[in-house]
A protein has these predicted regions:
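Conserved short beta-strand elements that form part of the metal-binding/catalytic scaffold
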Residues: 29-62, 106, 110-116
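N-terminal beta-strand motif that seeds the catalytic metal site of vicinal oxygen chelate
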Residues: 1-20, 48, 64-66, 116-121
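Conserved beta-strand positions that form and line the central face of beta-propeller blades
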Residues: 8, 42, 52, 90, ...
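Conserved catalytic-core motifs of GNAT/GCN5-like acyltransferases
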Residues: 10, 30-36, 89-94, 117-121
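N-terminal first-folded block
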Residues: 8-44
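Vicinal oxygen chelate
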Residues: 16, 68-110
Length: 121
């Protein structure tokens, strides 16, 4: 059974316009703003994965952050602590989208765990 997929990745930027120009030229990504999100713009790849470029420490964290989709945020957060990691930002809900938390893995790398919102009905 495959494990959690990388749902998206965030790139922190000190200069948003410079970073957007860089990723447009290098990767062909077209970051676009999304209503309700300041200091961060989102892009989609040709393979449907996506990501974001955000103002460092405001729209994103301080380092590149991968988001791993998990079936249960609570179960995964418990596993983080049981296996030598730590939670640095508890569960945060993005209404209509899902929930995420930011953790340090057993080696000190920062990753985020993402749980999709349950389908209506």
């Amino acid at each position: 059974m495959p494990g959690g997929r990388i749902s998206h990745i965030e790139f922190p930027a000190d200069d948003m316009e410079r970073a957007k120009r860089f990723y447009r030229a290098v990767a062909g990504w077209e970051p676009e703003p999304m209503e309700g999100f300041d200091d961060i713009e989102f892009f989609q790849t040709a393979h449907e994965e996506g990501g974001a470029i955000g103002r460092r420490g405001v729209g994103t964290g301080q380092v590149v952050r991968a988001y791993i989709t998990v079936p249960s945020l609570e179960t995964s957060l418990a596993a983080v602590e049981e296996h030598g990691g730590s939670v640095i930002e508890g569960a945060t809900e993005l209404p209509g989208m899902g929930r995420f938390a930011v953790v340090l893995d057993s080696e000190g790398s920062e990753v985020a765990l993402w749980e999709d919102v349950a389908p209506a009905g």
